[in-house]
Amino acid sequence: WAKHMKDMGTQVVFGVTPGKEGQDVDGIPVYHSVRRGIKDHPADVAMLFVPPKFTKDAVFEALDAGIKKICTIADGIPLHEAIQIRRAALSCGAMVVGGNTSGIISVGEAMLGTIPYWIDRVYKKGHVGVMTRSGSLTNEVTAEIVKGGFGVTTLIGVGGDPVPGTRFAELLPLYEADPDTHAVVIIGELGGTMEEEVAEAM
């Protein structure tokens, strides 16, 4: 997925796998830790591909290294650890997107996560922002947006787990500040109050 992200325009400057420092994967240097990598390659975003039981430690490591934007795809992060992740991020002014997300894409610019290779058939550049909790509905709804002649600026999958790192209402100001985004589509899920929070925020 790192190569796919590079192909989509993302500047992937290094990877982290403990015990594998010195290796090179698709032109991406590998380091033992985030702190070691960031000394040689300044970075402001971390994309985490780790199992649920290791996600909290990986998030905390990235936060400790000074990274303020983190995305994690892990599905099924233990509830108490998801709460700890959200609290830690909020306490240091950081943003964690996920878990249980396919990622983030700014169409034609960059992508984080596991958004599919056939992306160019669904995601076309336009002026509609998308926030989603549903993996299964995201591509279908986005395809309809494009079919209607609109296109997408940035899509953020907040994740379908009970306690996401970032909530819809917290993302809304980012879309409002983007001059290329003229409207926002929200794809919700059963349960929770995130959709109501957006209505109140507006």
Where in the sequence are the language-model features?
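Catalytic-core regions of core metabolic enzymes
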Residues: W1-M202
